[in-house]
Amino acid sequence: MAAKDVKFSRDARERMLRGVNILADAVKVTLGPKGRNVVLDKSFGAPRITKDGVTVAKEIELEDKFENMGAQMVREVASKTNDIAGDGTTTATVLAQAIVQEGAKAVAAGMNPMDLKRGVDLAVAEVVDYLAKAAKKIKTSEEVAQVGTISANGEKEIGQMIAEAMQKVGNEGVITVEEAKTAETELEVVEGMQFDRGYLSPYFITNPEKMVAELEDVYILLHEKKLSNLQAMLPVLEAVVQSGRPLLIIAEDVEGEALATLVVNKLRGGLKIAAVKAPGFGDRRKAMLEDIAVLTGGQVISEDLGIKLENVTLDMLGRAKRVSIAKETTTIVDGAGQKSEIEGRVAQIKSQIEETTSDYDREKLQERLAKLAGGVAVIRVGGATEVEVKEKKDRVDDALNATRAAVEEGIVPGGGTALLRASSEIKAKGENADQEAGVNIVRRAIQAPARQIASNAGAEASIVVGKILDNNAVTFGYNAQTGEYGDMIGMGIVDPMKVVRTALQDAASVAGLLITTEAMIAELPKKDSPAPAMPGGGMGGMDF
């Protein structure tokens, strides 16, 4: 086992604080509408430019092991806030630095670290209550756009696009962000349920110009096994032909004789038909077939349920107003499923999302939920250069997460104003003087985001904070973009309550651990042993 270096109390805290400050100082320059960029060197390719706090934090690794421990603890704050709220990582870092700095001073003055932490926790709980009461629920699309605009560093186009996407696919819908192939940023919305499987034969195409098969007012047969022979299907096929409607077959596969028979019937005009493979694999395929069944009001033909193909009747088939099948995707629009059954299925998937521990499973469940509940929107981010596109994509991701958080828990006045107001509303009393000091640490620390936003905008932080606190209006604050004071909500400068709350709770949690640290242990750097001397060249007795 390698030898360790151990640091205690003041020495340990000082080293750790240096690391906290290095990381936080690099991250906090990005805060606010006038926040600066940070350039990250990459081992290959062009450097990356970003204003995203967590991206900056993840790049920082310090040489000194003890300083690095402090930096990594604060990086954890940014990551945790990003995981829960998806935004607010810079605010969380600024808050953590402020609480640690104030706490370190108090510990150096001889106060009890555990009592300080209890005081900090008391004050944070009260601030969270205050924020919950101050939060305003989002009702209009304009308010959604405002949140998106603020989080995208004041870019209105992005805010509008996110508001439009959420309006079209609903709050449960999936909105994905991709890099565009062009310089324009655009929004594409896919109605209905789309999955990644296309037609099994190009002969099914009905629209040669667009290379798609379009079926109107269509029956849908859902089968979980392969179809290689159509003998068992003849009764249901005859019933479909008599109804005069088209048929879509979704099965594990349709092959050989079965596929050939379907193609021949389609070409002769006797049967309007198309076949696609079922989406997904294994258990996920079964679940997705069930989703399609619920959406279209049909049944999955499965021998597990004792249903055989020869016994299938028309009322077991799903129905939809329109189906569009391209080379690699199938879209089912306006399925005939019962609303109550779809809602029940949505609730079931939501409970699975809450229970799962796997990020991959959660992502797949959320995709299924979106396909059932709303639809899918894709924001394609464009720019003149690859570096610009990546920087803009970071901002769109942040804006999207902030907007979802705002819809979930409401909004509070932005620009650090909500926390600034909370600082004068803290009434918590500690059991002793040290706990009181912990409460005061939070009282001072939660002013840090507003101060940082002001100084990044080139204003004098203490004058800005003083002016805001002198005014009693709850929404009165400082617009760093224009340099004006006024009603923050009226000016459209708002923060999602969930983002502010998560940033404060995560910052206080990690800062509390750092304040109460008394010893730090790290491996001693390995000493390079000198290389052995090289033997002399040449051969004995020879003169070279």
Curated annotation (Swiss-Prot):
Location(s) in or outside the cell: Cytoplasm
GO terms for cellular component: cytoplasm
InterPro entries: Chaperonin_Cpn60_CS, Cpn60/GroEL, Cpn60/GroEL/TCP-1, GroEL-like_apical_dom_sf, GROEL-like_equatorial_sf, TCP-1-like_intermed_sf
Alphabetic keyword roster: ATP-binding, Chaperone, Cytoplasm, Isomerase, Nucleotide-binding
SUPFAM superfamilies (UniProt xref): GroEL apical domain-like, GroEL equatorial domain-like, GroEL-intermediate domain like
Gene3D superfamilies named in the record: GroEL, GroEL-like equatorial domain, TCP-1-like chaperonin intermediate domain
Source species, domain of life: Bacteria
Keyword Cytoplasm in record: yes
GO terms under biological process: protein refolding
Major location category of this protein: cytoplasm
Broad enzyme group: isomerase
Keyword Isomerase among record annotations: yes
Catalytic activity annotation: ATP + H2O + a folded polypeptide = ADP + phosphate + an unfolded polypeptide
EC numbers on record: 5.6.1.7
GO molecular function: ATP binding; ATP-dependent protein folding chaperone; isomerase activity; unfolded protein binding
Annotated residues for binding of ATP: 30-33, 51, 87-91, 415, 495
Quaternary assembly: Forms a cylinder of 14 subunits composed of two heptameric rings stacked back-to-back. Interacts with the co-chaperonin GroES.
Free-text function comment from the UniProt entry: Together with its co-chaperonin GroES, plays an essential role in assisting protein folding. The GroEL-GroES system forms a nano-cage that allows encapsulation of the non-native substrate proteins and provides a physical environment optimized to promote and accelerate protein folding.
Family: Belongs to the chaperonin (HSP60) family.
Alphabetized HAMAP family for the sequence: CH60
Protein name listed in UniProt: Chaperonin GroEL 1
Organism: Chelativorans sp. (strain BNC1)
